[in-house]
Amino acid sequence: MSCTSPPRAWAQIDTNALRHNLNVVRRVMPDHRLMAIVKAEAYGHGLEGVVKALDGEDCAFFGVATVAEACRVRDAGAKTCPFILGPCFEGEREEIVQNGWRAALSSMEE
């Protein structure tokens, strides 16, 4: 007898609803650039799937926490630039610059 159980809960992501919600925000704030936050696996909704659904929808950036997440956005084929919200290690700075990504600065050294 197996001691594993199938998942009892899951999320089904409606990509049309994601795009609709983005457009609602855009209508409310027409003069602002929008960043779709996809850090932490798009808050459990699947980073790659959300990126693919929203890429091309005129988001200014995809907000990620780390360089590793920025790589996942790139590897998903996104044209939209990742914006790294978390602190970066010194060894990651060159990769950020080479890829043309944006990053928040958390210290003067960065």
What role is predicted for each listed range?
Residues 2-5, 9-13, 17-20, 30-110:
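Active-site-proximal beta-alpha core segment in soluble small-molecule metabolic enzymes
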